[in-house]
Regions:
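N-terminal alpha/beta PP-like core and its mobile active-site loop of ThDP/TPP-dependent enzymes
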Residues: 1-256
Length: 257
């Protein structure tokens, strides 16, 4: 669910790890498939940095859970609580700013489409990209639908709002999504609860996928244009480029009628 969380677990003393000691469990091995990162500090002085790294990883990029597994003797000993101001995490590089060329391609595809639509997911809310989303929708006069987790990303009393799609969505939202020829999908993983049959969905339209997690790009749907980066930062770049192009659509689109 992309929820930031720190889970702290206890472990047998360091010297007994790997010896099948009483109540020992390989919690690191069990948790790795479902967490962003797992730490097991072996010395008391390693705890502050592990905590600092844990909170950083849980809250940056695509938010998610982090495990801190602390052996019993590490818990019982004393050490200075010096939290580092700077640290390095090998292999962890959260995406923030998008590739400008990709955003340009996304704009071109939207402008050249006859029936474009916006699908806003939960990532829009996590990134607090409310104003940017509304600006894009109003500038290009794009109807907006949301996933179940994206509900609230766009004002539902707005003239361009159609509400949520999917098996628990609105009929008019599902109808417009079915008829669209291009979708700007923002912060969504294309759950089957929202889009139904994956193959049928991607055959109908071109997909511009904007997401902070590169692992989501192309996972469930074939993507025509990928914009990898923080959703709010990516939409801000799109707003800026649209202003530079002086793009402004009107409400006389047959698609909107």
């Amino acid at each position: 669910d992309s929820a930031p969380m720190i889970a702290v677990t206890g472990q047998v003393p360091v010297a007994m790890i790997g010896r099948d000691a009483f109540q020992e469990s390989d919690i690191i091995g069990m948790a790795n498939p479902v967490v962003k990162y797992a730490f097991q500090p072996r010395l008391p002085e390693e705890v502050p940095e592990a905590v600092k790294k844990g909170f950083y990883i849980a809250q940056t990029g695509r938010p998610g859970p982090v495990l801190l597994d602390i052996p019993k003797d590490v818990q019982q000993n004393e050490a200075p609580m010096d939290f580092p101001d700077e640290f390095k995490i090998q292999g962890y590089h959260p995406w923030n700013d998008p590739d400008i060329a990709s955003v340009e391609k996304a704009i071109d595809m939207l402008l050249n489409s006859e029936k474009p639509i916006i699908l806003a997911g939960g990532g829009t809310i996590i990134s607090s990209a409310f104003a940017e989303l509304q600006s894009i929708a109003e500038t290009l006069m794009l109807p907006v639908v949301t996933t179940f987790k994206g509900k609230g990303a766009f004002p539902e009393n707005h003239p361009l709002s159609l509400g949520p799609i999917g098996m628990h969505g609105h009929a008019e939202a599902n109808k417009m999504m079915t008829e669209a020829d291009c979708v700007l999908a923002i912060g969504t993983r294309f759950s089957d609860r929202s889009v139904g049959t994956f193959e049928a969905f991607e055959k109908r339209l071109k997909i511009i996928h904007m997401d902070v997690d590169p692992a989501e790009i192309g996972k469930n749907q074939t993507t025509s244009v990928a914009v990898v980066g923080d959703v709010r930062a990516s939409l801000r770049v799109m707003v800026k480029l649209l202003l530079q192009r002086a793009v402004k659509k009107t409400e006389d689109s047959l698609w909107l009628k």
